Amino acid sequence: YSVYYLAGNHDKRFKAFISHCGIFNFESMYGETEELFFINHDYGGNYWDKSNAIAQRSYANSPHKFVDRWDTPIMIITGEYDFRIPYTQSLQAFTAARLKGVDSRLVEFENEGHQVFKPQNSIVWNREFFGWLDKYLK
């Protein structure tokens, strides 16, 4: 969540972003997870309850609402077996970045969940992560 939010609210403080399994769109996330306790707790409720000021404030700050300000390169890492934050959140963010013309890269692990555990995938993760930083921070 925080990386996607910062991408639209950073006033040129960052040269590049990397998001690993982040939440991009609070509204679609509400319907994509089975962990309703956490999402109701974190967001204050559902997005369609207009009388719930806490929830409405949360959803008003969903990162997808700030894509119009995205202008900084972003690499997005996700695992297709992530059942807490579905990989479709990453796909939405990647699609938005591409449509905005923001330099972006999607690294998708088809056999990983929220964390990268397989040794060969850890090597790829590190190579991609530090390669992105080298590209934009040197």
Model-identified regions with their sequence ranges:
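Active-site-proximal cap/loop segments of hydrolase catalytic domains
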Residues: Y1-K138
